[in-house]
Amino acid sequence: MSTVMIVGATRGIGLELTKQYSEEGNKVIACARDMNAASQLDELASGSENIRIEELDIAEALSIESAASRIGKDSIDSIIIVAGYVGGMPENQTIDNIDIDEWHRTLNINTIGPLLVARAFKENLSSSGNGNLMILSSQLAASTWPMGGMYVYSTTKAAVSKVGQILALDWAEDPIIVSIMHPGWVQTDMGGPAAEITAEESASGIRNVISGLKKEDSGNFYKWNGEIHPW
């Protein structure tokens, strides 16, 4: 069995990934930004010996470093960074009403945070001998998906996709596979009830992709169903 770390495990895709991995007997380090807002995760963990909850706020460098210190040198086979932020009024954003402070906040969560997590836990992934780092991005990050508005979310996800690609190049000699994932349009708090797939379907697809990755796949951008997503 593997050890999997889920960053952003309190709800939606992250919670479902925690559920699926733990039910198969894997050890899951489930990371929550706010321990007081993790009731669903707490309930899931109470019925499983395989789930360890850790506080990790991806927007705060000190929180990431503290989590890394608590986890220590334990080997981690896969890290899936689910945590993200849509960045206020996404459907109504225009060049005239963008909140620049909100843009900075979203960049910190969606782009800089995943880079800091990668840096903090690189040795944990390396020690597994075949580590996987998957960063959830979005189809809205792709130049092949032209869509107006949503400046804040789209640009910060485009940036983190590039972060993933660069990490794959820089870690080419390390035993770590880096991948970028479009999880689908998912029925979560962010995606809404009209979305195309459930969190269960998305999580299952993500797990299938990870299980089939090889080193030569590092740097690829995937859809939840296993297809390569064009950049």
Task: Please provide the spans of the model-predicted regions.
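N-terminal Rossmann NAD(P)H-binding glycine-rich loop of SDR-like oxidoreductase domains
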Residues: T10, G14-Q20
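Conserved glycine-rich Rossmann-like NAD(P)H-binding loop of the short-chain dehydrogenase/reductase
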Residues: E24-S39
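Conserved Rossmann-fold cofactor-binding substructure of NAD(P)-dependent oxidoreductases
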Residues: A59-K73
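Catalytic loop of short-chain dehydrogenase/reductase
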Residues: Y85-L107, L115-L116, K122, S126-A172
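C-terminal helical subdomain
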Residues: I180-P183, G192-W231
